Amino acid sequence: DGRNDTITLQVTVTDGDGDFAQQSVTVNTVAGPLFNDAPSGGSSVVTTDEGNIPGMGSQHETSATQPFGAATDGSFKMELHGADATVSIGGTELKVENGKLYHNGVEVTADAAVSVPGGAHGTLTVTGMDADGTVHYTYTLTTPVDATGNASNRPGEGDTGRGEAVHADAFDVTITTTGGTATGQITVDALDDAPVLSTLDTTQTTVADGEAALTGTLSFTPGADAEGAQVTVEVEGQTFTGTKANGEWTFTGGSDGSSFQLNGTAFTYTRPSSNTTDGRNDTITLQVTVTDGD
């Protein structure tokens, strides 16, 4: 009942003819803390960036993506009302005892961090807890996120998709004390990557009558969502579609006898004979579109 009490035990022993002996002992009880209040907390949202996944992302930064990396630090607050607790993060069980966070008997710190398995697109690592119940963690995005039909509740940055926030991962949090249970979730958003077309230039300013080949430089990166990416080149009414296999792009199209080839970053567009000997002055425009996998 949370009160300090005095307990008195009095014992009397009486023999067969009425003689007796009597003694008493007094015990003072001191009330300990009561943990009847239910815990609360356990939720947070963090943002990562697909464009900064090492070896995958386009690294193309905008005002919306500049502050974010593939790895991000986050935290959530627990209110335990002084009680010890069992904390489950993504199914990994930790203990709070005397204001410190433990995993398998070892205090969780930056030097003794705990990895939480089960991430769909990255890894979650718990790195410690402050005295006020704030749990710290790091999430690292390791694989691209399909943005198709997967928009987060936060605005994007236009039709290209770069900077669009998409849902990447979620880890359930359960906090249990003698006062009850609280549930929360660590939610991870990823800023969608987009292709970058860095160079499109020709090595010729004019093409002589009868000359079929137009050469130049084309360089681009599909970004993190490279799987399923496509490149199209539209020129002189023809559309060439590029697909990548074994590290090389191959273009098909050109129903009029024309062709488009890309060797590394060097391209060659070969005009059909009907366009090279018609005696007209022409303007040749190449329009290149790079579309990533989502």
Predicted regions and their residues:
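Acidic/polar, solvent-exposed loop/turn segments
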Residues: D1-D294
